[in-house]
Amino acid sequence: MTFPNINPIIFSIGPLAISWYSLSYVIGILLGWFYANKIIEKFKPQITKKNLEDFITYAVIGIIVGGRLGFVLLYNPSRYFSNPIDILKTYEGGMSFHGGALGGIITAYLFCRKYKINFLSLTDIIAPVVPIGLFLGRIANFINGELYGRITNSSFGMIFPNSDLMPRHPSQLYEAFFEGLVLFSILAYTTFKHKTLKKCGLNSGIFFTFYGLFRITIEIFREPDIQIGFILDSLTMGQILSVPMLLLGGYLICQSNPK
């Protein structure tokens, strides 16, 4: 397969460069906001549209700060400790989903505590929305030619310009499909067909469970970060960080269905 050599920068105005990566965040937040509003209109949960509007600022800060710090601390600390100013260069890529998730969870908790809102009621609304951002983010990773997969002889192999010119799995597209489209479809089905918002924590549990499963599986095809490599000879950082999400998801599902 041929890599579509797309310029990561959409356009520049003087020193200001607009990248596909940055645009993916903006579009993801706007589409997510729209979709969450539709869910609120349909099911009239405890969370109101005004609550959601107020939460957007918290969410953006939590996701961006958490995602960036997660990448800096977990994936490439030596580079950023040597050149701290590079931490601000988010337009170059380098965001950790696990860090962004933790940042979003912390800001959601602080928001709920301030406005006296049930925490899981909020995360249950957000859970069906997150795959939209995941899909767009992975497509942006693909355009950037980053986070590519392991060497393969299969017909799916693709030569990325920033790699060693060996055919590799386009693992960004695998993640976009499973963590984005498939996970979105699962949560849309459970939310609208099975009315999972009626059981506090269930949507959140479904998200964490399936995201953990998909991420752990797809990491088998993804090249480990060069500065980290394999952990315990065969595991990647992404797999290790996804195990707690998988366990948390199972716990929330069980808690939402007490016997």
UniProtKB/Swiss-Prot annotation:
Transmembrane feature ranges: 9-29, 55-75, 92-112, 117-137, 172-192, 201-221, 228-248
Pathway noted in the entry: Protein modification; lipoprotein biosynthesis (diacylglyceryl transfer)
Localization in the cell: Cell inner membrane
Keywords associated with the record: Cell inner membrane, Cell membrane, Membrane, Transferase, Transmembrane, Transmembrane helix
EC nos: 2.5.1.145
Membrane topology: Multi-pass membrane protein
Enzyme class: transferase
Any GO CC annotation of this UniProt entry: plasma membrane
PANTHER family membership: PHOSPHATIDYLGLYCEROL--PROLIPOPROTEIN DIACYLGLYCERYL TRANSFERASE, PROLIPOPROTEIN DIACYLGLYCERYL TRANSFERASE
Family in the record: Belongs to the Lgt family.
Protein name: Phosphatidylglycerol--prolipoprotein diacylglyceryl transferase
Organism encoding this protein: Rickettsia africae (strain ESF-5)
Gene responsible for this protein: lgt
